[in-house]
Amino acid sequence: MIILITNDDGFGSEGIKLLKEIARNFAPEIWIVAPDTDRSGAARSLDYPVKQSIGIKQHSEREFSVSGTPADCVIIALNKVMNKKPDLILSGVNIGSNVGDDICYSGTIGAVMEGAARSIPSIALSQVYHDKIDWHNTKVFAPKVIAKLVKVGWPKNIVMSVNFPATEKVKGVEFAEQGEYNIDGDLTFTENSNGSFSLNWSREHSGSGSINKIKEGFITITPVKLDFTDYDTLNTMKNSCADEFSSIAD
C-alpha cells in the first residue's frame, strides 16, 4: 500500500508527525506533501490558478512542503511529486474538531475532497481539544479506525471525516451527521495596538450530530459528499416550478 499524507496545519505540525507514525501500521511507502505554513480554513481553495508560482521544497526522499493550500498539495503530489498513485490519502491529524459548518471551512476536509475527486479513498482525521491538545485518543484509536474503514470501503465520491473526542474515556464509535452550529453566535472584535482587530467567534451547537456524540465521548465517523446537490429539492422544483420558469427565455 502507498499512502499520501497531507494536512492544513502545516508541514511541521505535531498532528502530521503523529499521522506518519500511524500510517506506518499500514504502508511501507509513505509520502508527505503538506503546506509550508498553517493554512487552516483554506477549505478546498487553490492558490495555483492565481499565483505566478508555487514553491516545492524537498525535505527527504518522500517528504515535501508546498507554498500552497492543502488542495494544492494533493494536486502537486499526484501530478508532480509522486511517481505512483496512492492507495489512500490521509489528512490531519487536525488540531481541533471538524464538525458542523467547520467542514465547509476546513482545509483538512478540502484536501481529502481533492483526493476523492480523483477516485482515491481519502480520510480526514481530527483531534478535539479544550485548553490543551492531547493526542492520546488519536494515537490509540486511529490505527483501528483506519483499518476498519479500509476493510469495509465506501463510494468513491465520498470522504470520511473522523473526529476523536477529548474525553478521558472513549465510549465507542458512532456514525453521525456533521451537526449544526448557530451561525449567529457571538462574534467579538478586540482592537489591537496597531489598529488591527482580533476576532473571537463563539458558536453554540443546535441540534444533534457529531458534535453531541463527541461531547459524550464517542469517536465519530461522518461520510461527506463531494456533490452538494440537494436532490430532493431539485426534483421538487423540477415538478412544481417548471411552468413558472418556462417563459423566461421566450
From Swiss-Prot:
SUPFAM superfamilies: SurE-like. InterPro entries: SurE, SurE-like_Pase/nucleotidase, SurE-like_sf. Its cofactor is a divalent metal cation. It is found in: Cytoplasm. Its main location: cytoplasm. Keywords: Cytoplasm, Hydrolase, Metal-binding, Nucleotide-binding. It comes from the Bacteria. Binds 1 divalent metal cation per subunit. A divalent metal cation binds at D8, D9, S40, N94. GO terms for cellular component: cytoplasm. Its EC number is 3.1.3.5. It catalyses: a ribonucleoside 5'-phosphate + H2O = a ribonucleoside + phosphate. GO terms for molecular function: 3'-nucleotidase activity; 5'-nucleotidase activity; exopolyphosphatase activity; metal ion binding; nucleotide binding. NCBIfam families: PRK00346.1-4, surE. Nucleotidase that shows phosphatase activity on nucleoside 5'-monophosphates. Belongs to the SurE nucleotidase family. This is 5'-nucleotidase SurE. The lineage of its organism: Bacteria, Pseudomonadati, Pseudomonadota, Alphaproteobacteria, Rickettsiales.
